[in-house]
Amino acid sequence: MHATYKSAIVRTGPNQVHVNDPEVYKNTFASASPFDKSRFFYSSVGVGDAIGAIMDRKQHHIRRTLLSPGLRANVILSYSPNLHKLVMNCADVMSGQARQAKSINLLRYTRSLTVDVIGDFTFGRPMGLVNEEDEMPELIRDLQDFSSQFHLWKHFPLLRKLVTAIPKSISRKWMPGFVQLREKSTAAVNEYLAGKQAGKPVSNTLKEGTFLDLLLNPPEKITSEAPKPSVLIDEGCAFITGGSDTTGFTMENATYLVLRHPSCLQKLRQELDEASRHIKDVFSPQHLLQLPFLSAVVKETLRLYTPAASPLPRTVPDDGVMIHGHFLPDGTILTHSLYLIHHNPNFFTNPKSFQPERWLGSSAKDLEQYYVPFSKGSRSCIGMTLAYHEIYTYLAIVFSRFDMELFNTTDRDMEWRDHFFVKRKGVLKVRIVRDRWSGEEFTSP
């Protein structure tokens, strides 16, 4: 679009423009930026009371201050034994599938794993999806359905009110993903509240308590009303969706890209083998986070396949703004695409090519300012540190333990469509050839 019109700024709607300029993006999304989130967009996403959809700056600051202690680096580090256990369980289940001569649908296992993790952080218990026997757990289907319908919500914001007002028997047929996701979040919140009322400890694995603990027990220095159940339910839906899809998508993509590039697989395998005692024997997430080539693979995957590829809308403030010679009056919706920033050839040579080495050279520091997979500023992804720990742990264990190959998966299968989060056109499958830790070899599906 920008190439067609030979302009960094293009009008995409009656009151909306898209700007493809990383420098403008930096100003728009800076912590002290006067550009607020677009009310039209964020009020339509179906979870209006969740942190990601709060538009009032003061209320957002309060909510982020309440939740941030549960996602600090030291908290996530203390959770690493539990994360390691969940990832190892996922690897064991995948190995069991291979033992039955079955291929592995990576979406099924990566999403199940990330839902289990975020369920532990939100409700105080993993959701148990990895160990479900269904070919695709119902909750994962709900998440996929919800994502598929996202553009309807975006363009018709009244749908949210309508879906919650009409009988469930109708709304469940019309918007099954959203309705069933909300029902599951409601059930989990009610179970949590009942446990609290009965005096049962909800979670003994999290240093600061669950997200619901943090919302219901604010520190004295923060003036905050007790959240209504609808707020807890919205946060539950938002954390399950945002905390599973983006992270699982990155795990899938990294697996595909490494298997698709044998030289990359060889380098990664060598690095992981040298660090095996920190992976297999005494698990050390601090050591994994320092592995240069693993880090480069993760960064390049997030650059190439930006999880939130949909343009992020902000509203021009009262005085208006001049961008590339065009005056935009107050109220204009200004959008930026993280995907386009990550694929800008002025900063990333051969931007469509998978080149982890670009993050290892002397110019890597210069690229960091254009690396924004979790956005930036005060509205950046609150769960970024947790996501990195999940991705590193998963990739380290899976590529240390298994010899794998792609199974009935083509480049066309990996093409994607924008549903705010990304939906793939096909299915990414792998075949586990051998368990390197046990020496067990598996027959082909």
Swiss-Prot record:
GO terms for biological process: mycotoxin biosynthetic process. Pfam families: p450 (PF00067). Pathway: Secondary metabolite biosynthesis; Alkaloid biosynthesis; Mycotoxin biosynthesis. Gene3D superfamilies: Cytochrome P450. Its cofactor is heme. Keywords: Heme, Iron, Metal-binding, Monooxygenase, Oxidoreductase. The keyword Repressor does not apply. Its EC number is 1.-.-.-. SUPFAM superfamilies: Cytochrome P450. Heme binds at residue 381. PROSITE patterns: CYTOCHROME_P450 (PS00086). CDD domains: CYP58-like. GO terms for molecular function: heme binding; iron ion binding; monooxygenase activity; oxidoreductase activity, acting on paired donors, with incorporation or reduction of molecular oxygen. The keyword Oxidoreductase applies. Belongs to the cytochrome P450 family. Cytochrome P450 monooxygenase; part of the gene cluster that mediates the biosynthesis of penigequinolones, potent insecticidal alkaloids that contain a highly modified 10-carbon prenyl group. The first stage is catalyzed by the nonribosomal peptide synthetase penN that condenses anthranilic acid and O-methyl-L-tyrosine to produce 4'-methoxycyclopeptin. 4'-methoxycyclopeptin is then converted to 4'-methoxydehydrocyclopeptin by the ketoglutarate-dependent dioxygenase penM through dehydrogenation to form a double bond between C-alpha and C-beta of the O-methyltyrosine side chain. This is Cytochrome P450 monooxygenase penB. The gene is penB.
